[in-house]
Amino acid sequence: MKVFITQLIYVIPGKEDVFDQFEAIAIPIISKYNGRLLFRIRPSVETIIETSIEPPYEIHLVEFDSAQDFEEFKLDEERKQFLHLKKQSIKEAFLIEGTKI
């Protein structure tokens, strides 16, 4: 069953370039594991209708053919070599896993 991963990503101010370096490596790897990046959004004040939390720097919506594909993506050796960039640049993130209804 397909699984959808939504992430709300909060980047440390001033570390946007480091975050972009990590994304340039991680995003292409998604397709190796039957995944597709459906959306990568940087919301602005003008696009937010209502919120009770701090707006994230980016929102990602990714589809994988199965939960196992997502787990294998997280274990990818190339991606793991660059996790230090993620740790250096991300203040916090929310990961929401779901299915299509």
Regions found by a protein language model. Name each.
Residues 90-94:
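A short, amphipathic edge element
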Residues 34-38, 84-89:
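A short, aromatic/hydrophobic, helix- or strand-capping loop or linear motif
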Residues 1-75, 96-101:
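Short S/T/G/P-rich N-terminal loop/turn motif that feeds into the first structured element of a domain
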Residues 69-88:
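C-terminal structural segments of small proteins and small subunits
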